[in-house]
Each structure stands twice: as structure tokens, then as C-alpha cells.
């Protein structure tokens, strides 16, 4: 607990009827007065004589009673023995208030005086005075009586609700038949309860006890034995034709439209692919033809050149032969 003078002033800033507030005093005076609590020898002092009058729960007197205060002071000056006895009583009260927390925490000498926790001092209890007037006692007694009446009414209403619910549940259980009992009657073979319409005819007939056979008892104990196991071969799955027949014509028309649209789209894609492939083939064919034509022209030109060369060579050969023959004749 932070025990600084300012924080202590804020904690002590309590408002009560006919009691002075800390705002009426200067903060410096209060700080000086509260610094006394940090003194380790606080118990040897008299805080009641050091603090101002009308503080710490002492009711301030009105201005008209100043003369009476002066008279009391004069009486105290005349009787110093009474004053000393009163001071001793005050010291004992202060020591009793401070001794309980100190004994709980430990020795006063070992504790740090600055960190003493004054939470043990309930200032509100010291400042508030108990009101023993008849009016307050009557109010509290009337409030207690009202609270007791309300609690008794609430408990009685709860008991009534619970009892009514229990009665309703018992009546409904009596009115409604038990399903398990009914099933037991059906399985064992007991006679059904006669209705009001058929009561006359049933009363005329003599009652007979039901004859329970060994087979009925076995059927009741093992109800699954009465049912025959179905043949798996006889169980046939529904055929596609029945499934198609169960379909509505609107669904068939929608499906045909969807399939036709898909087919048209596929056919268009095929046509586009075929046209593109044929165009590519034609272009390649034209290129090959152009190349063949070029090669043919080049070859024809070469053939013509070679033919002219051959002719020239033949002429030279003949001319050389003519030159050689006359020389050979000689």
C-alpha cells in the first residue's frame, strides 16, 4: 500500500454528514499531521492532541456553541486531574487499536515504519457512528419482515408449481396407456380391452383364458426367427428401361438438345480442322511444283549450254583432223 501523504489524503477524503471534509484544511497541514504515522515511536505520542479538532470522526459543533466550548476549556484548566485521566483513557484506546495489527505482523521494531500497512485501520468504522434511533430500528425490522414474507411466498409458489406438475404427470400417466404393455399383450395373445360400443356383445360371451403354445413363446422370445431370410437371387435391381421410362419427357428433350448442341460443336471443330489441313497440303503442293519448274528450267538451260559446247568441240576436232592429214600424205 502506497503510504505517501498525498495518497493518504486522497484515501481520507470521505464525506459524512456534519463532518468536516479534507478540502476544508490545507494539504500542507494534513501532510504534517500524517507524517506522524511514519514515526516508529508513534505509540508514545498523543495523536488526539496533535491533530486538529473536529477531525477523525469528532462532530464539528456549530458556531453558536463557541461559548460552551470556552466554558468547557475553563473547566478543564481548573481540573487538571480529570484531564490526565481522560488522556490516559485515550492513550489506552489508541494502543488497543494499533496493537492488534502489530501483533499479527510481528515486532514493531523489526517492521519498516514507512511500509506499515494501515489497512487494519478501518477509517470508515472509526468515522461512522452507529445510529441507535428508534426509527432506524423500525425500518430495519420492517425490511426484514418484508423480505421474509417475499421469500415465503416464493417458496410456496414453487411448491405449488411442483405439486401441480407432479399431479399432471400422474394423471397423464393414468390416462395414456403404456406402449410396452400394449406390445406385450399383442405378442403374448391377450384379449384386447373392450370398448363401450362392443361391451354388450362381449359381456354375453364367456371369458376364456388365452392358450399360449410353445411356438408362441418361441416367437415372443425370438421375434427374428419368424421372418424368413429373403433370397438374394430373387431381389433384382431396377433395369435401365424402367429407369428411362420413369423419366419425364422434359428431361429427355433437354438431354437431346444438349447432346445435339455438343454434336454440332464437335462437327464444326472437325470441319475447321479439315479445311486447315487441306489448305496446308495445297500450299505445300504448290511450293513443290514451283521448285520442280525451277529445276526443269535450270536443267534445260544447262542442256543447251552443253549442246553448244559439244558442237564447238566437234568443230575443233574436225579442224584438227584436217590439219593432220596433209602432213601425213608427205
Curated annotation (Swiss-Prot):
Induction: Ubiquitinated by pof1. GO terms for cellular component: nucleus. SUPFAM superfamilies: Leucine zipper domain (SSF57959). One of its GO terms (molecular function) is RNA polymerase II cis-regulatory region sequence-specific DNA binding. Transmembrane segments: none annotated. Residues 264-327 form the bZIP domain. Residues 292-320 are annotated as: Leucine-zipper. Residues 244-262 have a biased composition (Polar residues). GO terms for biological process: positive regulation of transcription by RNA polymerase II; regulation of transcription by RNA polymerase II. It is found in: Nucleus. Residues 150-165 have a biased composition (Low complexity). Residues 133-165, 238-277 are annotated as: Disordered. Residues 133-148 have a biased composition (Basic and acidic residues). It holds the Pfam family bZIP_2. Residues 270-288 are annotated as: Basic motif. Keywords: Cadmium, DNA-binding, Nucleus, Transcription, Transcription regulation. It comes from the Eukaryota. Interacts with pof1. Mediates cell growth arrest in response to cadmium exposure, which is essential to maintain cell viability. Regulates cadmium stress specific genes. Belongs to the bZIP family. This is Transcription factor zip1. It comes from Schizosaccharomyces pombe (strain 972 / ATCC 24843). The lineage of its organism: Eukaryota, Fungi, Dikarya, Ascomycota, Taphrinomycotina.
Amino acid at each position: 500500500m502506497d503510504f505517501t501523504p498525498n495518497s493518504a489524503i486522497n484515501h481520507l477524503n470521505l464525506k459524512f454528514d456534519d463532518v468536516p471534509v479534507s478540502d476544508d484544511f490545507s494539504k500542507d497541514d494534513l501532510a504534517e499531521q500524517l507524517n506522524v504515522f511514519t514515526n516508529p515511536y508513534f505509540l508514545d505520542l498523543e495523536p488526539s492532541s496533535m491533530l486538529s479538532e473536529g477531525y477523525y470522526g469528532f462532530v464539528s459543533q456549530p458556531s453558536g456553541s463557541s461559548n460552551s466550548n470556552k466554558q468547557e476549556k475553563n473547566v478543564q484548566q481548573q481540573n487538571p486531574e480529570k484531564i490526565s485521566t481522560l488522556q490516559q483513557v485515550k492513550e489506552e484506546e489508541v494502543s488497543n487499536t494499533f496493537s492488534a495489527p502489530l501483533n499479527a505482523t510481528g515486532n514493531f521494531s523489526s517492521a519498516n515504519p514507512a511500509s506499515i500497512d494501515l489497512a487494519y485501520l478501518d477509517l470508515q468504522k472509526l468515522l461512522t457512528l452507529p445510529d441507535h434511533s428508534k426509527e432506524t430500528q423500525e425500518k430495519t425490522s420492517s425490511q426484514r419482515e418484508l423480505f421474509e414474507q417475499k421469500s415465503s411466498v416464493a417458496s410456496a409458489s414453487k411448491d405449488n408449481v411442483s405439486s401441480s406438475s407432479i399431479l399432471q404427470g400422474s394423471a397423464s400417466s393414468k390416462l395414456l396407456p403404456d406402449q410396452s404393455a400394449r406390445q406385450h399383450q399383442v405378442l403374448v395373445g391377450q384379449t384386447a380391452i373392450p370398448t363401450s360400443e362392443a361391451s354388450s356383445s362381449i359381456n354375453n360371451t364367456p371369458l376364456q383364458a388365452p392358450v399360449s403354445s410353445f411356438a408362441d413363446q418361441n416367437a415372443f422370445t425370438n421375434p427374428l426367427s419368424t421372418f424368413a431370410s429373403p433370397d438374394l437371387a430373387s431381389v433384382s435391381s431396377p433395369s435401365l428401361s424402367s429407369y428411362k421410362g420413369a423419366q419425364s419427357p422434359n428431361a429427355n428433350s433437354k438431354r437431346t438438345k444438349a447432346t445435339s448442341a455438343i454434336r454440332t460443336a464437335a462437327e464444326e471443330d472437325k470441319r475447321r480442322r479439315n479445311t486447315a489441313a487441306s489448305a496446308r497440303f495445297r500450299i505445300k503442293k504448290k511450293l513443290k511444283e514451283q521448285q520442280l519448274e525451277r529445276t526443269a528450267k535450270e536443267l534445260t538451260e544447262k542442256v543447251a549450254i552443253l549442246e553448244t559446247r559439244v558442237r564447238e568441240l566437234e568443230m575443233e576436232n574436225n579442224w584438227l583432223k584436217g590439219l593432220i592429214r596433209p602432213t601425213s600424205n608427205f
